[in-house]
Structure formats: C-alpha cells, structure tokens
Amino acid sequence: DVLGSRGLGDVYKRQIMDVVYNHMYRYENVLNNTVPDYFFRQNEDGSLSNGSGCGNEFASERPMARKYMIDSLLYWAQEYHIDGFRFDLMGLYDVDTMNAARAALDALPGGRDILMYGEPWQGGGSQLHRYEANKANLAMLNERIGIFCDDTRDAIKGGCFNAREPGYAEGKPGSFWDVGGAVAAWCRSDRLPPHAPSQIVSYVSAHDNFTLWDKLLLVRYEKPEFTAADSTALAQNRLAAGIYLTSFGLPFLQAGEEFARTKKGKGNSYRSSPALNRLDWERAEKYHALVDYYRGLLALRARFPRLSSTDPHAPDALYFFSLEQPLVGWTLPAAPCDGAWWRALCVFYNPTDTSRVVPLPAGRWKLLSDGTSSSLWRGASRTYEREALLMPYSATVFGAV
C-alpha cells in the first residue's frame, strides 16, 4: 500500500483535501441510519433544513456530529498525511466546531502546518442558530482558519452571477477602491470584522462559476470564441493574477487558470461532461507564456515574505499613492530580518487600454515584473528613478535597491 505507508505528501508535493461534511446525498444515509434524525438539522415542522441546497444539512453543533467531523479529519491527517482541508459551505458549520477542529489538528506532530480554509457561505436558509463560520464571524475564528474572499474575486474580475458585469481588470469605473481593500486583505476596511490577513484567501476563480478566461471574454464580447487567443484578454488575465498575487493573504488559483482554462462559457459545470471539465494540457503549451507569468509571480512573492504575514497589523505598513483614477499604486517595506530580496516593493495596476506614466518614490527601483514578463527580477533588469511607464492592462512591480 504505497499511499498508506508513504502518505500522499510523499508521492506528490502537498495535498489539500476537499471535505464536504455539510450534506449527504439523501435522507436515507449511513449517518441517519445509525441515529435517526440526530446528524441533520430539522425545521420546526420536522422537515429537513436545507442550507446546503442539496436536501439536508449536517448538524455540526451536536456533540457526536462534531466528534465525527474532528475524528475523521484527524484520521485523514494521521493516516494519509493530508496537508490541509478545504471546507465546502463552511458557513453551515458553527464557529466552535471549526475552532475545535483547528485545535485538534494543531495537537498533532506538525499539525500547525496543516491548512484550514473554506467557503464562508451557505447554499440556502439554515436552522443553524448559533455563530456560523462565515465572514460576519471571521473575528471569532482561529486566525489560521481562512475564507474564500468573494469581495476580492468580484472586485478584480466582476460579479460571478452576472456574466457581463466587469471588474477592475476589465475597467469597471470606481472599482479601484475595492482593489485597494483587496491588496490589504480587507484589514484596513470595515467591510469585514477584525482578522489576520492570512485568513483571506485571495482568488479570482475556483471550480464554481465562470473561469477567469471565460469571464474576461464574456465581458468583452457578445458571442466569444473561447478557444481563440485574444491579446486583450491575455493582458487582463495577467493583470488579474498580478493583483491577487501581490496582495496580502493566501493566494489561490483554479487548476488551469494559468493557461487560460475555458469551460466554453459554462457558468456552473458540476453536472457537465468530463470533456468540458478536464484540463486541456494542449492549452498549457499554447499559453506557455501565461504559465511562465504565473510561475514568475509566485516565485517573486515567495521572496517577499511580508505579503504572507499573519500579523493583523502588517497591512498598516502599506502606503497608497494618490494617482489618477483608475490607477492603483502602493509601496510596502520589507519586514525586519525576514529574508526579503528587496528593501521594499512598489506596485502599480493599470486597467486601461493605454500606457500611463507614474511617479516613483525617492530612490532607485529595479523593475521586477511588467505587463508581460514576471521574471525580470531574476536578471540584471533596468532600474528606474523618478517615474516609470505602465503598459496597458498591467501589474508592474518594482523592488527597492
């Protein structure tokens, strides 16, 4: 038994397991057959509460239901060496259960390195009448339990339920304010309760809703050609990635986003064919430059650890420039003795279709990434003083030298 003896983490890199405790397929299931009407919430008339949108919802607040959740998490972590857990519809679980699960995992050898994050929403009205593990109660969750931040997603690429609604990357007027909030992981905004930046999962696409590529094309065209290369959509894709990969928080991307994954405009593909949902590796070759762009940004981010800080006050060090709208620019000094490659970062976002000139802070700034290449930092790239040119639809990153 290769996996049982070595663990998934030895075979691959690190494995996150999607755990869907929030519902069962139907009322007649193994848990309900064990103790009828115990593991699932009921309405006042005795019918099943349906906060999952799938017919029932798991009663995490009940002692033996909570124990079932935590014991099974520990089993996966100990026997299969799972490196993290992603909780489907986490808003259907109570805060106490989630914090107890965090404490139980932390007690394992190396358990504090196990990730925990989830969807802070529900799939319908719920009978959970205590503190839900959602955005409103973020301050009550352990600082190492993260949430998918739909505020960040919608600010960058536009609302997920309206295919034609643009976001900052597509040039939506006024959205630069929300992008500033996203950069700070919403720690400097009253949009969310007090929290650590590491609790914010910064992303623009996941398995639900439109892929980033499809969304960009649906905003631009009435009848998009999803499989065709589009230079503007590629630039906007790089801009979107450049924003959330230079923001505070925990970055997340959908598999294939890095090579312009398409589901042919299908907004919710959970019932679609394997052919539509599969990863098209030919696109990885076709869009290898986009793959390289993601790879370079991830490596750049790893060399500036402050962006991944767990300190709730770390985003306070951000300084935002006063620029012509809708440009966004900011600078962030490195934390003392954190091994950063640069003394500070200076980042600009340009969501327009024209080049823009922006002033730079005092000093010499090395160009680390521009609108097309994110690996300029690896070599002897050009240094700038006083001002710099931003390409259309671009995220541009400088490092203080």
What does each model-found stretch correspond to?
Residues 26-127:
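Active-site neighborhood of glycoside hydrolase catalytic domains
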Residues 13, 18, 81-83, 110-114, ...:
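Short, well-ordered coil/turn segments that N-cap beta-strands
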Residues 102-103, 108, 112-259, 266-270, ...:
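Conserved alpha/beta catalytic core and glycan-binding cleft of carbohydrate-active enzymes
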Residues 1-12:
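Single conserved hydrophobic/aromatic residue that forms the stacking wall/gate
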Residues 65, 69-76, 97, 203, ...:
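Alpha-helical packing segments of well-folded alpha/beta enzyme cores
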Residues 23-47, 131-138, 265-275:
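Aromatic- and acidic-residue-enriched segments that line the glycan-binding/catalytic groove
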Residues 230, 234, 245-253, 257-259, ...:
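Carbohydrate-interacting/catalytic domains
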